[in-house]
Amino acid sequence: MSANQVKLTPKDILEKEFKVSMRGYNQDEVDQFLDIVIKDYEAFQQELDELRQENARLKRQVEELQKRPTTPTGTTNYDILQRLSNLEKHVFGRKLYE
């Protein structure tokens, strides 16, 4: 839902005046109902703002994570230490470990 689709603001609802006719609606009931609508509208607007901020934060986080180099799958510190140990044995011979 973009801001362009929203037709009313809480202020628009608050300031809306209805014409009175002889057999019109009870003005107090209309006012009470509009008060509820305004509160809901404000809550929805606040939640929408929070979700937009969270969305922007998560997009930034995704971008940062995508920039980080990835380690090859299955390569752990233990695997690296094993490879290093094997290379040392090969280069220096078994005397180092005896």
Swiss-Prot record:
Q: Keywords, A to Z? A: Cell cycle, Cell division, Cell shape, Coiled coil, Cytoplasm
> Subcellular localization, per the record?
Cytoplasm
Of which family is this protein a member?
Belongs to the GpsB family.
What protein is this chain from? Answer: Cell cycle protein GpsB
The record's gene field reads gpsB
What is one Gene Ontology biological process annotated in the Swiss-Prot or TrEMBL record? regulation of cell shape
Family matches, as Gene3D superfamilies: 6.10.250.660
Say if the entry is tagged with keyword Cell division: yes
